[in-house]
């Protein structure tokens, strides 16, 4: 009799009476440090101001394909081995397909909890290309509208459940709007009987920075944010790559930075429209109150900081600090300062669905997120295949050049003064020990709190 009672109780836990819907909005290259959220007024009203803001959310890898892999699988880069945006670097290669892709949050929700799953927009940079094996529908997704290749706004192809559909350069072809319409049509036919997981991945604010025609020149005259680090590296204390370019930048470069900054903002206006339409569609179907909406980005972006013109990839706040907002059932309007990571998305989505599974992150729905958590941010560089040349020195080789950087954000929020070499030897050793352990961590070892855990 005892066994029957226990079995019945477990069934009640595993199959909630009314499972929650999940909408993940994953934008591209959206910074938080350079006011990237400012154009998203409707998003702020409908999501940010109605839920929880995670003010210290960081990309596990400050570049598109690897961090999207981390979001999908809950794994740090050293565990999923997507190293960069190239096929040789693991982006949508066969190892990804045979391994990590078979353990995304979509598969768990779809196979274990009966979620109807929907994906529209950018997946992985090399997805659908001939070199990566062509079009396909990745496992775990019922409705698939994946962008072929990297971010575009016009003249692109979508893989619709594995069949190619080409789009042109007319206003109705604008990718963010196309994603919005597929999503709205999907929501219209949903019922409370079957929960759904929806991922919307528009191209904004990634290059080539093409706004929808209705948003052209909406921010005419806007200039790139002149942070204290903009076009400035007085100390010359950053790693070698950051010191390669001319500083200050040539005068002719600054107007180009201003133009791209403005157009990035203008691309986000269509995202803002999309968010408002999704919100309204959920409300009209009377399922908004039963739906979690998550808004985040794959990485940040710099525009002129430390004299580096445009990109991500760097270990500075502009590139690694990303927006993360969640609204939904039981989510109060609040701000959480505890450090969180892209790898937490997997555990969070599973938690919403009533599931648990191994990952390198933790659910953000927990009430005891620690302010003392240490996060790992790793990037192995373009053209890296993860295999060391036999003649390449290792970190135990005294001839290896290495760079140590540390910053006091209380006194130096723009990372102008590197304290890495002035740090006491014991403190530097503790940080180094933490790093060496984190780069080989797996599962709950990665969510270590405080120095005693390392």
Residue ranges and their predicted role:
Residues 24-27, 31-118, 129, 149-150, ...:
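Active-site segment of extracytoplasmic enzymes that catalyze sulfate/phosphate-ester chemistry
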Residues 1-9:
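Classical eukaryotic N-terminal signal peptides for Sec-dependent ER targeting/secretion
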Residues 37-40, 52-76, 83, 119-132, ...:
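Short, solvent-exposed turn/loop segments enriched in Gly/Ser/Thr/Pro and often Arg
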Residues 19-23, 49-55, 66, 79, ...:
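Loop/turn elements at helix/coil->beta-strand transitions in domains of secreted/extracellular proteins
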Residues 29-38, 148-174, 184-194, 198-342, ...:
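Active-site-proximal cap/lid insertion segments
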Residues 140-143, 148, 299-305, 341-346, ...:
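C-terminal cap/loop subdomain of S1 sulfatases and analogous C-terminal strand-loop tails that border
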Residues 6-7, 17, 57:
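Cleavable N-terminal signal peptides
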């Amino acid at each position: 009799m005892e066994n029957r009672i226990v079995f019945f109780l477990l069934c009640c836990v595993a199959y909630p009476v009314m499972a929650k819907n999940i909408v993940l909005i994953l934008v591209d290259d959206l910074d938080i440090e350079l006011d990237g959220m400012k154009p998203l007024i409707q998003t702020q009203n409908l999501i940010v101001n109605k839920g929880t803001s995670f003010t210290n959310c960081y990309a596990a890898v400050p570049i598109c394909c690897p961090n999207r892999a981390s979001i999908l699988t809950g794994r740090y880069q050293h565990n999923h081995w997507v190293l960069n945006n190239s096929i040789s670097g693991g982006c949508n290669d066969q190892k990804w397909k045979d391994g990590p892709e078979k353990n995304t949050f979509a598969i768990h929700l779809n196979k274990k909890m009966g979620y109807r799953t929907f994906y529209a927009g950018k997946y992985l940079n090399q997805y659908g290309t001939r070199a990566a094996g062509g079009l396909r529908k990745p496992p775990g997704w019922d409705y698939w509208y994946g962008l072929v290749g990297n971010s575009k706004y016009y003249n692109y192809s979508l893989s619709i459940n594995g069949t190619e559909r080409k789009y042109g350069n007319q206003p109705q072809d604008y990718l963010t709007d196309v994603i919005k319409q597929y999503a709205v049509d999907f929501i219209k036919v949903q019922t409370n009987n079957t929960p759904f997981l929806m991922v919307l991945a528009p191209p904004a604010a990634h290059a080539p920075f093409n706004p929808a025609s209705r948003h052209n020149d909406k921010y005419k005259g806007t200039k790139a944010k002149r942070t204290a680090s903009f076009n400035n590296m007085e100390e010359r204390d950053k790693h070698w790559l950051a010191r390669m370019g001319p500083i200050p930048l040539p005068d002719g470069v600054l107007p180009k930075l201003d133009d791209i900054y403005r157009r990035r903002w203008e691309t986000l206006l269509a995202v803002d429209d999309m968010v408002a339409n999704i919100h309204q569609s959920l409300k009209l179907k009377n399922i908004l109150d039963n739906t979690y909406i998550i808004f985040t980005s794959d990485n940040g972006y710099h525009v002129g900081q430390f004299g580096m013109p445009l990109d991500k990839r760097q270990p500075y706040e502009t590139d690694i600090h990303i927006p993360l907002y969640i609204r939904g059932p039981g989510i109060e309007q609040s701000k959480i300062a505890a450090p969180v990571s892209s790898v937490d998305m997997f555990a969070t989505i599973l938690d919403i669905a009533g599931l648990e599974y191994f990952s390198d992150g933790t659910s953000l729905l927990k009430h005891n997120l620690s302010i003392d958590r240490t996060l790992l941010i790793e990037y192995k560089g373009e053209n890296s295949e993860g295999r060391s040349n036999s003649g390449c020195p290792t970190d135990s080789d005294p001839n290896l050049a290495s760079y140590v950087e540390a910053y006091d954000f209380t006194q130096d929020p723009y990372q102008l003064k590197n304290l890495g070499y002035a740090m006491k030897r014991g403190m530097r050793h503790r940080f180094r020990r933490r790093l060496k352990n984190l780069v080989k961590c797996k599962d709950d070892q990665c969510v270590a709190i405080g120095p005693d855990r390392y």
